[in-house]
Amino acid sequence: MMEEEELEFVEELEAVLQLTPEVQLAIEQVFPSQDPLDRADFNAVEYINTLFPTEQSLANIDEVVNKIRLKIRRLDDNIRTVVRGQTNVGQDGRQALEEAQKAIQQLFGKIKDIKDKAEKSEQMVKEITRDIKQLDHAKRHLTTSITTLNHLHMLAGGVDSLEAMTRRRQYGEVANLLQGVMNVLEHFHKYMGIPQIRQLSERVKAAQTELGQQILADFEEAFPSQGTKRPGGPSNVLRDACLVANILDPRIKQEIIKKFIKQHLSEYLVLFQENQDVAWLDKIDRRYAWIKRQLVDYEEKYGRMFPREWCMAERIAVEFCHVTRTELAKIMRTRAKEIEVKLLLFAIQRTTNFEGFLAKRFSGCTLTDGTLKKLESPPPSTNPFLEDEPTPEMEELATEKGDLDQPKKPKAPDNPFHGIVSKCFEPHLYVYIESQDKNLGELIDRFVADFKAQGPPKPNTDEGGAVLPSCADLFVYYKKCMVQCSQLSTGEPMIALTTIFQKYLREYAWKILSGNLPKTTTSSGGLTISSLLKEKEGSEVAKFTLEELCLICSILSTAEYCLATTQQLEEKLKEKVDVSLIERINLTGEMDTFSTVISSSIQLLVQDLDAACDPALTAMSKMQWQNVEHVGDQSPYVTSVILHIKQNVPIIRDNLASTRKYFTQFCIKFANSFIPKFITHLFKCKPISMVGAEQLLLDTHSLKMVLLDLPSIGSQVVRKAPASYTKIVVKGMTRAEMILKVVMAPHEPLVVFVDNYIKLLTDCNTETFQKILDMKGLKRSEQSSMLELLRQRLPAPPSGAESSGSLSLMAPTPEQESSRIRKLEKLIKKRL
């Protein structure tokens, strides 16, 4: 019974002592302990096992028990001490609270005493300073009254003097007096309710109005709208009148400026009327010469009359530009058919020179916001084409590949007058664009004629495989056009010029590059695509001559240069054109065209070497391999293949020295074409004896070594072949070697032969297996059981369609080739 009660007590105690993880974590942080007994996950069994790890340790059990009892006794003592200490805690707390409350009450009493004393002190200070404050207010009011009376006296006297001086046109004295009167009047704004003050204010406004009308009348008299200018220099009266106008309503100043400029340019409107000979573009110099003379005349006669901050000379020049732009636009619309490109460029050049003259002479401070927005200069460009204006001498000295790669010059400062007149020519720049279209068309025709007359680059010279000189000439001309057009406009005309550039880049690619690629022909006539793919039995394969190989390489190098330069051209055009039009600059199509030329050139080189090797592969498949009695040196067909490789590859490599990556592409494409074709012809070697298979294996190894050495064959400098190329050759030719090793293996026992086939050929399938059985000369009846065994032992492919697809791509069958040939022939006939 006692034991049950003890168990219940222990369970209740454990339930009470079961703490939440948060509480347990807080206890561990406040009272860190390394004692296992303090851990929340304490396990009594593990603790006992730690104390007594072995049976021998049980000998010390009494000592351990005594230590634990001693520890329990100490804990009990500590607990009793703590419990006793908590007996009087409640009473002590109540006593401390009462003491705190008493202290707070005493503090409140002291604060109240301090507040009462402060209020008494404040009242005492107010009583002492009451009389002093009244005296201070009286002094302030008296000072204000005296100041106001003085201002009133000054205002009344100033108004009287202002009216008298206005009548006598004493503008020099009026300028100083008026400003003072205006300043004094500002002090009386809050007194405008007083009739006398309001009356003085109205007299000042009336005097200002009278002054404005009087000054305008004086200027009208001195510079009448009709008739000639007043002889002699300006009077001091008008100079002082301008100082007064600076103080008056800004509209007075604007009216004076407007009338003076209008009178100053009246002669210009008469001299250069639309019906006058000097108004046309061929005499545009006279317009600018006239305004330059007028500016000199203004500085001599009227430079001191107007205040410097009015910038009258610049205002005259700006108004002249606006009038000239309007007049030129009007006359060009009327006589649009008479505008020729030389005349247009002449007028634009003279106009831009004049705008540059204005930028050097004036700051552009008088240009209004609207004018600046309308005539906003194009964004600064870092295009190296802007370093100077090209001349014929410079074009002759221009390097072939340096035109678009010159270092950038520092950005030139903006011209605030750019386009202020030349903007009127932009609607007529189509004449310039059409002229460039015609010139580029003639340039392309000249390139075609020169190529026919001079022929392709000669082999065994520095020219072999070099970039065609016509390519550099084309981009030099493009540079000239770009610089010229960017000086004329950076808006829509630049987009139109870009379209012209695109047109003739495509024409150059078609007429000069693609159009001059050699055609593959035979002695009997044209060579069709099928004849390139089919085997040549008894017919001589037409190879490209040395000159033709050099020409193909030269066209490839030229296309590569055009591709890189066109990409740079696109970047420079985007730098030149307005920001809003950048999205419309896109030469991707032209770059793709040059990429197509490069691919076509490489394909021609591959087809030529591939076709040259076809007769040798055909000879290999026609040999009687079952009659070979001993293994000797490499077979004649291997020697023939190696001979063709040694003839073509060094020529191609030397001519593509400047475009190494495309030579690597040629090697890769040839390997991808030759190796599957070699394996296809290998399957045609049937039946084959053991010795014949050994000879074929030797030949295959020889071809493998030659192909691995193909990038540097015949070269004095031995370079390691690119890893991508080596991987293709090793993978393809190793497959051919594995096929021959399977052929050489005995076909009995069947299980061993099938397992050996699966092991050696990772891309094994029943189709390849049957071809190997045909090479061994086995009968169909023998093959059926072996094929069935193979199907049973073949692992299931992850995707049958993908597996078979990849195998068919790697080793196309003759049936697949003939089917492909027929489709291509039908497509060609349909196109023709």
UniProtKB/Swiss-Prot annotation:
The modification Phosphothreonine is found at T391. GO terms for cellular component: cytosol; EARP complex; endosome membrane; GARP complex; perinuclear region of cytoplasm; recycling endosome. One of its GO terms (biological process) is vesicle-mediated cholesterol transport. Its main location: Golgi. It is a peripheral membrane protein. Residues 386-397 have a biased composition (Acidic residues). Residues 398-412 have a biased composition (Basic and acidic residues). The modification N6-acetyllysine is found at K110, K360. The keyword tRNA-binding does not apply. Keywords: Acetylation, Coiled coil, Endosome, Golgi apparatus, Membrane, Phosphoprotein, Protein transport, Transport. Residues 373-412, 794-822 are annotated as: Disordered. Residues 97-138 form a coiled coil. The modification Phosphoserine is found at S377, S580. Component of the Golgi-associated retrograde protein (GARP) complex, also called VFT (VPS fifty-three) complex, composed of VPS51, VPS52, VPS53 and VPS54. Component of the endosome-associated retrograde protein (EARP) complex, composed of VPS51, VPS52, VPS53 and VPS50/Syndetin. EIPR1 interacts with both EARP and GARP complexes and mediates the recruitment of the GARP complex to the trans-Golgi network. Interacts with VPS50 in an EIPR1-independent manner. PANTHER family: VACUOLAR PROTEIN SORTING-ASSOCIATED PROTEIN 53 HOMOLOG, VACUOLAR SORTING PROTEIN 53. Belongs to the VPS53 family. This is Vacuolar protein sorting-associated protein 53 homolog. It comes from Pongo abelii (Sumatran orangutan).
